From Swiss-Prot:
Similarity annotation: Belongs to the BCP1 family.
Function: Involved in nuclear export, actin cytoskeleton organization and vesicular transport.
The UniProt record lists the keyword Disulfide bond: no
Subcellular location(s) per record: Endoplasmic reticulum; Nucleus envelope
Source organism of this protein record: Schizosaccharomyces pombe (strain 972 / ATCC 24843)
Principal location class: endoplasmic reticulum
Gene: bcp1
Keywords assigned by UniProt, alphabetized: Endoplasmic reticulum, Nucleus, Protein transport, Transport
PANTHER family: BRCA2 AND CDKN1A INTERACTING PROTEIN, BRCA2 AND CDKN1A-INTERACTING PROTEIN
One annotated Gene Ontology cellular component of this protein: nuclear envelope
Protein name as it appears in the record: Protein bcp1
Matching Pfam families: BCCIP
Length: 282
């Protein structure tokens, strides 16, 4: 799968594209591009979506700029050519070598604070990996797309990322990661309070939780990442003032969004990417 570069002329250069076919919708050709300055505002919006209610805890402009400072690493997906807004983005940030940059200090502090509330074991492990003398290199995977984007566009992005990181390593750039930390989002389905109020009470019978707090995925591929993860944290957003009826997706249920952090070894991540290509083949 080839990727278009900023300097390529759209009128004369054709890239490989991914055609997603769905019998219920029109066919769409998705093109892959390097991150470039024109993507700044779209990146900010995608990062805001990724961080959910906690997006105010991180300087999104600085984070978008940092990602754009690595133009040969990572991908965007567009449908209307190079000058259009990306529908998806993927990049990776070295949390060790960039530890002194203000936005990474801010982001790392936020991540640690959320782990302290949800998984102290993973909190301690990550802090050890990020110590200056740990000998480890942790790559933070930043992946987000518009809600209705087909998952089939994602595996090629990861496959290209592996290739780009290897090229960077060959040039002695700091992308030889020992671990990857995936930042993502999940949700649980919860019963509507409105339905509780409307439903007549029944003596001697307690209401049962609608989903048993089953974790659901905004990103389907996260299910495969969880299978190979060293550790997992599903954490509540710090700024969440939650009303289940503001996020109702079914007649009798709402959704409760939450953050997700997955820690993986380099080997497990690299081995999983080809499997994602098979599972979600277009």
């Amino acid at each position: 799968m080839a990727k278009r570069h900023a300097e390529e002329n759209e009128d004369t250069v054709m890239s490989e594209s991914l055609k997603v076919v769905d019998t219920d919708f029109i066919n769409v050709d998705f093109e892959f591009f390097d991150p470039q300055p024109i993507d700044f505002h779209a990146f900010k919006n995608l990062l805001k979506q990724l961080l959910g209610y906690d997006h105010t805890n991180v300087n999104l402009s600085a984070l978008a700029d940092l990602i754009l400072s690595q133009p040969l690493l990572g991908s965007t997906v567009k449908v209307d050519g190079n000058n259009s807004d990306p529908y998806a983005m993927l990049s990776v940030i070295n949390l060790n070598t960039r530890r002194d940059e203000p936005v990474i200090k801010q982001l790392t502090s936020y991540i640690i604070s959320r782990l302290a509330k949800s998984n102290s074991r993973l909190e301690n492990e990550l802090q050890k990996l990020l110590e200056p003398n740990s000998g480890s290199q942790v790559g933070l995977i930043v992946n987000e797309r518009l809600i209705n984007m087909p998952v089939q566009v994602i595996p090629p992005m990861y496959n290209m990322l592996l290739e780009e990181m290897q090229w960077a390593i060959n040039e002695n750039e700091p992308y030889n990661f020992t671990h990857y930390l995936l930042l993502s989002r999940t949700y649980t389905e919860i019963e509507s309070k409105l339905m509780d109020d409307e439903r007549p009470s029944k003596k001697g019978k307690k209401s049962k939780k609608t989903s048993g707090e089953e974790v659901m995925f905004f990103h389907p591929e996260d299910e495969q990442f969880r299978e190979v993860a060293i550790d997992i944290a599903d954490y509540p957003f710090a700024n969440q003032d939650f009303n289940p009826d503001a996020n109702r997706v079914f007649q009798d249920a709402g959704i409760k969004p939450q953050g997700e952090l997955l820690l993986m070894t380099n080997e497990d991540f690299k081995n999983l990417v080809p499997k994602l290509m098979e599972i979600y083949s277009a």
